[in-house]
C-alpha cells in the first residue's frame, strides 16, 4: 500500500469536517434549533395517546410545526363547537346539559368537519384525546377510510405512573394552545409566561396526586383495549416518554421514518470508525 501523503490526509480531514458540519446542522434541527419545517411536502395522519403528563402537550406542537398539520385536541374542539353554536355544537350542548355523554357519531362528525374545513389539516392531523374506546376507533377508521385519509400511526407515549405524579404536580399549561411546561423539567423562558405568546400560564386545579391517580386508573382501563386494537392493525408504536423531550422527539422522528433522523445518527457512526474526536 502506498504511504499516506499529506495532501491525502488534508483532503480526508476536510471531508470529515464538512460531514461534521452537516451532521451538526441536522442534529440542531432534531433538537428544534434549526430552521423551519424540513418536511413541507410530507404529511402525517396520526393519533397521539398517552396518560396525562406524558408529554403530548410538548410533542404535538412540534409534530404540527414539522408537518404543517393540524392538532385536534377533541376536548378543546368540542368546547369550541359548542361556543360557536354550530349545528353539531348545539346538538352536543343539548346532550351535555341533560347530563349525557356526547355520542361517538357526533364526535366523529366533528372531526370530519374539522378535517374538511380547517386549512391546517390539508397536510395531515394529530388527533389527541380520541378514540377512547374500540367502538370509537372503528367509527373513526371507517370515516377516515371513506375520505381516503386512513391513519398512518397510533403512537403511545409510555411512562411509569409514579414518575407521572412528580411531573404533573409541577405542570404549567397555556390554556389557549394547550402548550405545557414544567416548573423543573421544562420551565418557560419567563416565569409563568407562555414562550410563544407571552400570555400567562396556569396550574390546573386537578393536577394533584389524588386526582391524578384516579385519572391514571381510568386512562389505563380505557386505553388498553384501544392499544390492542391498533396493535392488530399494525400502526401502533410505543415511545418511552420518561426520556427528556429531545430524546422523545428523536424517537418520534424515527417512527415517522424521517431522513433527517437517519442522517443525525451518522454522528455516532463517525465515533465508531474513529473519524470524530
From Swiss-Prot:
Region annotation NMP: where it falls in the sequence: 73-102
Primary enzyme class: transferase
GO biological process terms, semicolon-separated: ADP biosynthetic process; AMP metabolic process; ATP metabolic process; DNA replication initiation; pre-replicative complex assembly
Region feature LID, mapped onto this chain: 170-207
Keyword presence, Ribosomal protein: no
Main location, first listed in the record: cytoplasm
Keywords: ATP-binding, Cytoplasm, Kinase, Mitochondrion, Nucleotide-binding, Transferase
CDD domains in the cross-refs: ADK
Domain notes: Consists of three domains, a large central CORE domain and two small peripheral domains, NMPbind and LID, which undergo movements during catalysis. The LID domain closes over the site of phosphoryl transfer upon ATP binding. Assembling and dissambling the active center during each catalytic cycle provides an effective means to prevent ATP hydrolysis.
Family membership noted in the UniProt record: Belongs to the adenylate kinase family. AK2 subfamily.
Name of the protein described by the UniProt record: Adenylate kinase
Amino acid at each position: 500500500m502506498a504511504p499516506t501523503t499529506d495532501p491525502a490526509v488534508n483532503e480526508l480531514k476536510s471531508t470529515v469536517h464538512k460531514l461534521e458540519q452537516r451532521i451538526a446542522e441536522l442534529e440542531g434541527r432534531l433538537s428544534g434549533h434549526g430552521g423551519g419545517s424540513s418536511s413541507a411536502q410530507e404529511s402525517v395522519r396520526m393519533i397521539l395517546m398517552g396518560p396525562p403528563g406524558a408529554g403530548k402537550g410538548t410533542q404535538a406542537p412540534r409534530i404540527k410545526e414539522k408537518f404543517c398539520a393540524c392538532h385536534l385536541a377533541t376536548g378543546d374542539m368540542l368546547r369550541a363547537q359548542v361556543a360557536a353554536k354550530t349545528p353539531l355544537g348545539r346538538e352536543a350542548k343539548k346532550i351535555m346539559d341533560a347530563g349525557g355523554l356526547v355520542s361517538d357519531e357526533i364526535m366523529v362528525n366533528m372531526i370530519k368537519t374539522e378535517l374538511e374545513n380547517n386549512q391546517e389539516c390539508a397536510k395531515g392531523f394529530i388527533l389527541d384525546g380520541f378514540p377512547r374506546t374500540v367502538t370509537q376507533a372503528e367509527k373513526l377508521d371507517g370515516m377516515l377510510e371513506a375520505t381516503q385519509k386512513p391513519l398512518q400511526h397510533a403512537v403511545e407515549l409510555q411512562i411509569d405512573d409514579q414518575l407521572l405524579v412528580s411531573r404533573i404536580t409541577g405542570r404549567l399549561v397555556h390554556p389557549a394552545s394547550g402548550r405545557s411546561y414544567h416548573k423543573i423539567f421544562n420551565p418557560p423562558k419567563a416565569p409563568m409566561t407562555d414562550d410563544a405568546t407571552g400570555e400567562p400560564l396556569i396550574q390546573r386545579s386537578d393536577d394533584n396526586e389524588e386526582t391524578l391517580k384516579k385519572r391514571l386508573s381510568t386512562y389505563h382501563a380505557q386505553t388498553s383495549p384501544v392499544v390492542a386494537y391498533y396493535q392488530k392493525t399494525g400502526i401502533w408504536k410505543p415511545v418511552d416518554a420518561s426520556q427528556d423531550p429531545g430524546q422523545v422527539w428523536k424517537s418520534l422522528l424515527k417512527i415517522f421514518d424521517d431522513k433527517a433522523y437517519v442522517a443525525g445518527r451518522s454522528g455516532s457512526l463517525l465515533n465508531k470508525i474513529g473519524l470524530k474526536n
